[in-house]
Amino acid sequence: KTIRHAVQKMLPDFSNPRGAEVGIQIDWFQNGKTTQLRIEQLSDGYRTTLAMVMDIAARMAEANPDMPDPLQTEGVVLIDEVDLHLHPGWQQTILLDLMRTFPNIQFIVSTHSPQVVSSVKPECLRVIDWLDEQPRLIPVPFSEGAEAQQVLLDVLGVKSPRVEQLEIVQKLKKYQQLVD
């Protein structure tokens, strides 16, 4: 019951995850029609997100069997590369969706996605840089609502928004120099 509730909150188009003869099945509601799917038929992004949500919910239910709503459990969850396999649009909402589904959980996540970074307040971010084999925290002046290119340059430390090694980029750079 807790797992089903978590899946429904996190992914409203999906419901009723259940064991089947072969693996796990889930119902997908789209365009007024429900389709039964095997987990294997879903994209890696949906599979990893469903697995993560079902795992967190199962652990909450197991740790609090007498709690009326185990999704209200307090705790800390670590997630490495929370954006892994997710479409950029979903990367923008994954943390908000997780916090809505598990409101009393503190999520500690790693990411290299400007989409994820731009969904978080700067005071909640820790950018770690390694200098001389020592970790160093870099202050983040802004993040929430920032454009991806700005996050890449100013938060994630990407040197250029373009792939400088591409011939077309080098030609464009040369053209701009000639014009200037």
Where are these regions (language model features)?
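C-terminal alpha-helical "lid" subdomain
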Residues: E164-D180
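Coupling/switch/interface segments within P-loop NTPase motor domains and analogous charged loops
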Residues: K1-N31, V179-D180
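Coupling/switch segment of ABC-type P-loop NTPase heads
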Residues: K1-Q8, L152-V155, S160, L172
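Switch/communication elements of ASCE P-loop NTPase nucleotide-binding domains
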Residues: G23-V163
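Surface-exposed alpha-helical segments enriched in charged/polar residues
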Residues: H5, L96, R100, K173-Q176
